[in-house]
């Protein structure tokens, strides 16, 4: 067991995959753990009702299901190439400005603008994070088979990253 762990640290594919999934889950955990609170908090958030929050979560889930199938089909064609991962990373990097300058104003506008904002937000948030999670995990699993390291050990870094960032953000906010 000790030799397997020692050899994992010498495997550059393990290190890259572990670091990539760690950073992805860190970036997801910093905002997703507070998304519900942001939607419902009347003082520092949008002050939505539980029903409105549920609608947003439902539409996000539907968009995630559709985008996951699209990502899966595209990634099956790409094999182990990271082009789709780079695209998802770019979308994920744009989530902060999108929420600040597009999503929040549309959600607070009400009416048809709010509904369009919910739809647009479900596509962006799902494309960048919620559906992207499955792709990052699938790529890591493919790399683990191809380059000889334990997927579970690499995936654990993602869970660790999410937990650490959510804990730190909880203390800060």
Outline where the language-model segments fall.
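Cytoplasmic helix-loop-helix junction between adjacent transmembrane helices
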Residues: 121-157
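Helix-loop boundary and gating motifs at the non-cytosolic
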Residues: 3-65
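C-terminal ends and interior cores of transmembrane alpha-helices
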Residues: 90-111
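Small-residue (Gly/Pro/Ala) motifs that create kinks and tight helix-helix packing interfaces
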Residues: 36, 71, 165-173
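Residue-level signature of mid-helix packing/kink "hotspots" within the transmembrane helices
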Residues: 61-69, 162-163, 167
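Short hydrophobic/alpha-helical segments at membrane-entry points of transmembrane helices
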Residues: 16-17, 108-110, 114-122
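Helix-to-loop junctions at the C-terminal end of transmembrane segments
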Residues: 66-80, 173
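Cytoplasmic membrane-interface "Motif A"-like loop-to-helix N-cap segments
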Residues: 76-90
């Amino acid at each position: 067991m000790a030799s397997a762990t020692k050899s994992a640290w010498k495997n550059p594919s393990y290190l890259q995959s572990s670091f990539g999934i760690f950073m992805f889950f860190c970036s997801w955990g910093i905002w997703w753990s507070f998304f519900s609170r942001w939607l419902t908090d009347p003082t520092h958030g949008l002050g939505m009702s539980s029903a409105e929050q549920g609608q947003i979560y439902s539409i996000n889930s539907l968009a995630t299901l559709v985008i996951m199938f699209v990502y899966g089909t595209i990634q099956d064609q790409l094999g182990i190439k990271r082009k789709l991962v780079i695209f998802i990373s770019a979308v994920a990097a744009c989530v902060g400005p999108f929420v600040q300058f597009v999503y929040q104003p549309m959600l607070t506008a009400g009416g048809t603008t709010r509904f369009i904002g919910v739809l647009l937000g479900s596509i962006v948030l799902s494309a960048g994070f919620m559906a992207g999670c499955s792709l990052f995990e699938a790529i890591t699993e493919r790399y683990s088979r191809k380059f000889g390291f334990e997927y579970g050990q690499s995936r654990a870094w993602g869970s660790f990253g999410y937990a650490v960032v959510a804990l730190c953000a909880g203390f800060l906010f």
